[in-house]
Amino acid sequence: FTFAVENAYLPFNYIDAETGEALGWDYDVFNHMGELMNFTPVYVPTAWDGMIQATADGQFMIAGDGITITSERDEIVDFSNGYINLAQKVLVAADNLMVMSIDDLKSGDYTVAVQKGTTNYEFAVGELGEDKVKAFDTFDFAIAAVISGDADASIIDETAGLGYMGANKDKVKLVGGDLTSEQLGLAF
């Protein structure tokens, strides 16, 4: 059984910086599936931007990675039942006092860092326009841009935002209300 993981989406799948161990909810679930069904999972680190199509093409049996269930994606892959409902939120540097909501991002001269190919990217472009959006290959890079000041904010799933807050203590925070409500599932 091959499982596609990105290893860059806290808390779903990531590499522990101190131990080098692959951790997260996806690993816990896939390992448990292996125990129940008597197989050893084979994890294949995969770039996000090709993961869903590669799963549709049969390169992987299942893809994890906090995949939002959308009608467009459902046309090429099947999904499990949703395993979590979450909201998209605005994430900013902890010392940022200027951006407190999506409205601030809309009205000001701000740059928003997001991962390309995600519903967060689609939302940011739809609400703010492409000129305000910087697309990155992973959310790790997008969050690093916020922390370094190369971007003013990110649009991120709340659960992942909390994961990045835990991993970057006192460096980032979530602000404002819920932007959307989404359901995540496993793709196969």
What are these regions (language model features)?
Residues F1-G66:
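Extracytoplasmic small-molecule ligand-binding "clamshell" domains
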Residues T2-A4, L91, T111-V114, S154, ...:
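Short, well-ordered beta-strand segments
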Residues H32-L36, V44-P45, D49-I62, I76-D78, ...:
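Short helices/loops that flank or line small-molecule/ion binding pockets
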Residues N7, A17, G24-D28, L36-N38, ...:
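Extracytoplasmic
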Residues N7, I84-V92, E158-F188:
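Periplasmic-binding protein-like
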Residues N13-A17, F30-N38, I102, T119-D137, ...:
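Ligand-binding cleft/hinge of the Venus flytrap
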Residues A8-P11, W48-M51, I67-E72, D95-M98, ...:
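Solvent-exposed loop/turn segments at secondary-structure junctions
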Residues A93-Y110:
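Flexible hinge/capping segments at coil-to-helix
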